[in-house]
């Protein structure tokens, strides 16, 4: 290219001519200089770093658990297990570029515990702590592709939406799938009929959790068949599964009884243990109905115990966003000071423990307890304080009648 021609060409972005830059790259009717290329590269790298806050691993396992403690009461062992698993997962991601002879596998997690024990809250709080995109799905709504129901790819779409369709961010996110025990196959024997919501879903999930490049329809799969797909690599997405696994305790007891070789004390110890799920082995999950390949992709298994009365009482008041604090805030918006006697909280916790609905049952009881107050008190100029006493709670159990304290 002649000097005159070179100088007549300029960068389409910054306007500098060829002699003012080191390199000018030509495209169809446009030019870009090396300086603008460096600038664009820096912007892209900075944007990528902004979605990789966990790369710095500022939060160590102890610090992750400390934050979990602020929102989740009890379940100490599960919080410790999750803190270590998540820390190791993101430590693995931050060192993917480092050449190593040892390839570290992903540590997906299974949370086993009764309804209301805190499985969903733990997963959601983890995502908030780590500042990564988070998506939640119910395994009972999933079916194999081609059948009525939700495709596995729709879960990835939820994660994409949580990441504002930033693919890099989504590929480092967390997906929580609840009720995974409901997709166990109906029996250990292969059925002639198609199990589209059981083993078939496990097979579909298997491909995603072990790591694959999935084609995700941005508008939802079955309604818009001709749309363009977004490619998502699931290698580095952390999957957390949760389930109550009703009946698994019998399988665990049976295994211990069969392997005890006459040591009845060991069997009795397992049977009487409140948290029998802490003895769960992969073979128990296979016996329950999860396929071996699926179980093999979830190396971290931890159990959450049933919440007792004292823990439920703490849950009412201690977390940052506790139910008592939430209702106090609601009443405060109407210039009413809401107070609970300690004895009243104990009765509420005791009622929830009897119902065996865990922390979820606490909200239902409080809603019933405070319904009349929330209906009557707004706009009542002579009401500025409400005190919930033990007697009021006990009266609710009989007649649902409450009264106001002026």
UniProtKB/Swiss-Prot annotation:
It comes from Ehrlichia chaffeensis (strain ATCC CRL-10679 / Arkansas). ATP binds at residues 114-121. Belongs to the ClpX chaperone family. The gene is clpX. Pfam families: AAA_2, ClpB_D2-small, zf-C4_ClpX. This is ATP-dependent Clp protease ATP-binding subunit ClpX. GO terms for cellular component: HslUV protease complex. GO terms for biological process: cell division; proteolysis involved in protein catabolic process. Zn(2+) binds at residues 11, 14, 33, 36.
């Amino acid at each position: 290219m002649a000097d005159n021609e070179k100088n007549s060409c300029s960068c389409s972005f910054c306007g500098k001519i060829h002699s003012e830059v080191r390199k000018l790259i030509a495209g169809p009717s446009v030019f870009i200089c090396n300086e603008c290329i460096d600038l664009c590269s820096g912007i892209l790298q900075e944007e990528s770093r902004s979605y990789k806050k966990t790369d710095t691993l500022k939060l160590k396992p102890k610090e992750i658990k400390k934050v979990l403690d602020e929102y989740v009461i009890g379940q100490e062992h599960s919080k410790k297990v999750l803190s270590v698993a998540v820390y190791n997962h993101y430590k693995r991601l931050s060192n993917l570029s480092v050449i190593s002879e040892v390839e570290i596998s992903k540590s997906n997690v299974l949370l086993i515990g009764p309804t209301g024990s805190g499985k969903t809250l733990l997963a959601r709080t983890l995502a908030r702590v780590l500042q990564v995109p988070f998506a939640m799905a119910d395994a009972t709504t999933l079916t194999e592709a081609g059948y009525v129901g939700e495709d596995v790819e729709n879960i990835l779409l939820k994660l994409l939406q949580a990441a504002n369709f930033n693919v890099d961010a989504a590929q480092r996110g967390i997906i929580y799938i609840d009720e995974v025990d409901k997709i166990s196959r109906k029996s250990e024997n292969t059925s002639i009929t198609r199990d589209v919501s059981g083993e078939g879903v496990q097979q579909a999930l298997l491909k995603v959790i072990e790591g694959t490049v999935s084609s995700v329809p941005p508008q939802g799969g079955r309604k818009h068949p001709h749309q363009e797909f977004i490619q998502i690599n699931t290698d580095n997405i952390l999957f957390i599964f949760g389930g109550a696994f009703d009946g698994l305790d019998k399988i665990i007891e049976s295994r211990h009884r069969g392997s005890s070789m006459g040591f009845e004390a060991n069997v009795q110890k397992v049977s009487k243990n409140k948290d029998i799920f802490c003895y769960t082995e992969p073979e128990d999950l296979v016996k329950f109905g999860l396929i071996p390949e699926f179980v093999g992709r979830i190396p971290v298994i931890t159990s959450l115990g049933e919440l007792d009365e004292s823990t439920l009482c703490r849950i009412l008041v201690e977390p940052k966003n506790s139910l008592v604090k939430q209702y106090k805030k609601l009443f405060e918006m109407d210039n009413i000071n809401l107070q609970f006697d300690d004895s009243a909280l104990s009765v509420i916790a005791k009622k929830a423990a009897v119902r065996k609905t865990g922390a979820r049952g606490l909200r239902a009881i409080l809603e019933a307890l405070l319904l009349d107050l929330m209906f009557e008190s707004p706009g009542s100029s002579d009401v500025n304080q409400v005190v919930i006493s033990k007697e009021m709670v006990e009266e609710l159990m009989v007649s649902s009648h409450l009264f106001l304290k002026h």
